[in-house]
């Protein structure tokens, strides 16, 4: 059973798909710049949802759009002395690079607004014919007061909104709109802007109508799940509902899911506030893509995610341990490839282990099924990784280590389960570069050098050696003044 918090009903609901294929639409990026951590947070959350639905034997059709015509794109094109198309094409390529690096599955379809102009115009015409839209001098607006259900997603009071907006609008806009709260479906082209031909003259679509038209064209009138950031609830998603349900006479989406924002010093991370870190910058600074992915999943998708250096360091340490366990087969040099046919495991032990692992899988599914509790799912991952990591520390230090047959079977089955469940979270093994940069002889030599430094009261040198080894994945354990052991972390 999968339960999800539905923004529309304001409660957690059992997920019930419309038919055999779960239809999901996710609001995509406006392609004028590189993606930041806030984008990563959103698309990682929805990637986990998609992977978990597939793991739970659902068929999924996942659509995510590109907004490739917008004021921000036009502004960037002007700044770069290029065209709207050049700016969007360049940033679509960069978007894919970033998402691929984070292990985010590519959507089944990624429609672009500029490829749906005919559908958008048809959609607006339907709204006009039904009395929900009106044109003024080349602009077309949606009449909010014609829709009695407007505000049902965001709980906005349209009467109060209307009073508050009165007087804040330019006279020209006031003269065109029937009510200040009405929003643009089609915008008349300015002299220096790209344009598309339409029944209302040259212009371009409004932001909200793009998604309504693409949802209908790609997935139909009613979909299972609509996704986006909490900053899109109003006005974007509220306006989508108003447009689509007025035009189609049907519910737009059964479930509305929204992720929380990434905060920096208590403020939302955003390009407008100039307090953002791009995914590219973070990775270039030495943070691995899977560390970023792990970091995002440590907090439930609906809650704010506080971006701090300390939290990132903690995520890096935690991911390093899981990654070590995922590298189990590589680091054991083939010793665990299989159980020999002549080796027999007691059936009673097999059944016991099978039951224990099935319980862990069940708890994993229960965690993700409880409104995508990724932190709970990670706890199960840690439980599976721990014995593998502990064994690796012994295996790498003790030459000719003898392995009990039951232990071998236990570790192999644990590893297989770990691999399967980390795939559901989209966590993939990263190359252990540091593990290959230092030998056991070098470790012993540095430990001896450190002991000499400590005896000579050169504690700065001793700390320098400890930190050097830690950077290479070696944690020192001082058992006494004379004895220091180590483990790989």
From Swiss-Prot:
Compartment(s) of residence: Cytoplasm
Gene Ontology cellular-component terms listed: cytosol
Reactions catalysed, as given in the entry: tRNA(Cys) + L-cysteine + ATP = L-cysteinyl-tRNA(Cys) + AMP + diphosphate
Alphabetical keyword list: Aminoacyl-tRNA synthetase, ATP-binding, Cytoplasm, Ligase, Metal-binding, Nucleotide-binding, Protein biosynthesis, Zinc
E.C. code: 6.1.1.16
Record flagged with keyword Nucleotide-binding: yes
Motif window: 'KMSKS' region: 268-272
Binding positions for Zn(2+) per the UniProt entry: 27, 211, 236, 240
Domain of life from the UniProt record: Bacteria
GO molecular function terms noted in the UniProt entry: ATP binding; cysteine-tRNA ligase activity; zinc ion binding
Pfam families, A to Z: DALR_2, tRNA-synt_1e
Cofactor: binding comment: Binds 1 zinc ion per subunit.
Motif ('HIGH' region): 29-39
InterPro entries reported in the protein's UniProt record: Cys-tRNA-ligase, Cys-tRNA-synt_Ia_DALR, Cys-tRNA/MSH_ligase, Rossmann-like_a/b/a_fold, tRNA-synt_1_cat_dom, tRNAsynth_Ia_anticodon-bd
Membrane-crossing residue ranges in chain numbering: none
Binding annotation for ATP: 271
GO BP of this protein: cysteinyl-tRNA aminoacylation
Subunit structure: Monomer.
PANTHER family: CYSTEINE--TRNA LIGASE, CYTOPLASMIC, CYSTEINYL-TRNA SYNTHETASE
NCBIfam families listed in its UniProt record: cysS
Protein family: Belongs to the class-I aminoacyl-tRNA synthetase family.
Protein name per its UniProtKB record: Cysteine--tRNA ligase
Species assigned in the record: Prochlorococcus marinus (strain MIT 9312)
Organismal lineage: Bacteria, Bacillati, Cyanobacteriota, Cyanophyceae, Synechococcales
Encoding gene (name): cysS
